[in-house]
Amino acid sequence: MKRGIYAVLLVGVLIFSVVASGCIGGTQTQTETQTPEKTQTPTTTQPSPTTTTSPTQTTSQTPTETETHTQEAECGSGKVVIWHNMQPNELQVFQSLAEEYMAMCPDVEIVFEQKPDLENALKVAIPAGQGPDLFIWAHDWIGKFAEAGLLEPIDEYITDDLLQKFAPMAREAIEYKGHYYALPFAAETVAMIYNKKIVSEPPKTFDELKEVMEKYYDPNNEKYGIAWPINAYFISAIAQAFGGYYFDDKTEQPGLDKPETIEGFKFFFENIWPYMAPTADYNTQQSIFLEGRAPIMVNGPWSIGSVKDAGIDFGVAPLPPIIKDGKEYWPRPYGGVKLIYFAAGTHNKDAAWKFVKWFTTNPEVIKQLALDLGYIPVLSEVLNDPEIKNDPVIYGFGQAVQHAYLMPKSPKMGAVWGGVQGAIDEILKDPKHADIEAILKKYQEEILKNMQG
């Protein structure tokens, strides 16, 4: 997405900043899904602190010349106020769609209010009864906002038929501790970006990927088999491929000492790292691909602008499955989801629900967001639309989202990132001889201590 829903998490080595606006949450220079700290990757979970000034209100009753969407709208009445921190280009598209809805539902008024410091504005206004009906941000706020009583449950509106319209990761993103608080409209994760001049078709299995890495690994000429930033966010795909995890949102426990997680880490450092440049940072790895010194890069939608600027003829595809002992294991990278949340004490819940349901389940709306803004759809049927399938970026990342592991929603995840990164940094001191199992178990204990206070 435009600057990606990209979160920057730095706890110890990472911080929670936010991998979506271009980002998942709003649109500041930051996004909200949590990812490792890199200037090119996700930005921050916390909007940069600025004083909230008088809200900029935008209300329109006159439809613009946008395509007429055929899905019938359920109509409420009265005003629905939506707080956001979107960029101007995003806001323009959202307003256009809202105007279309208002043309079908003349008794409702949709008002967008810009909040530069959205999180703090919500934390002050909602308890005072002065909050919005809705607000837009990434799913990573759902845990801490629900715990603080800042969200309005919408359980009475949720049906199984509705949930099945969305990708599995998106369905999971809108629920916290048995209650639903939002509906999803876009997502983000990492995938393979491949140089078609070097590799005409993406590898379909990990064995095929390994053949490509072996073929093009030529360190004496500064050429490598793959470009892949090494940090907690980016290698989550392999670390979690065999059923392991950094953190279980349901039990709220870390999982670095799980056999499946250990297997994932070992697989990465035994089967991928040997074909990489020894410098693991984001900028170096991306530059290797942009300079044509690697056939494939693992990265997110936020990197596509740089890939295009480099003049590379590229494609996007999910990381391929690992076939082991006759079983297929799909890499499961972390992903984030953009949501429209219901604020606690919403003043016009029924009208807000009808608008949000229309907005998030109308295929033409989601298609327009994808084509105009580069948002990755989570409405499953849109991924089969011919225009979407013909867009290599949207379709490729959309397929990757189907295998993504949702970024944890619990506030306790904050204690996990630093421990995971610490383990990775220790392994990188000597990847060939590192006792990966012992290192992961060591940092499991460190995370548990940090979680306890």
Curated annotation (Swiss-Prot):
Residues 27-65 have a biased composition (Low complexity). Keywords: Signal, Sugar transport, Transport. It comes from the Archaea. CDD domains: PBP2_Maltodextrin (cd13657). One of its GO terms (cellular component) is ATP-binding cassette (ABC) transporter complex, substrate-binding subunit-containing. One of its GO terms (molecular function) is maltose binding. Residues 27-73 are annotated as: Disordered. Residues 1-29 form the signal peptide. GO terms for biological process: maltodextrin transmembrane transport; maltose transport. InterPro entries: Maltose/Cyclodextrin-bd (IPR006060), SBP (IPR006059), SBP_1_CS (IPR006061). Involved in an abc transport system for maltotriose. Belongs to the bacterial solute-binding protein 1 family. This is Maltotriose-binding protein. It comes from Pyrococcus abyssi (strain GE5 / Orsay). The lineage of its organism: Archaea, Methanobacteriati, Methanobacteriota, Thermococci, Thermococcales.
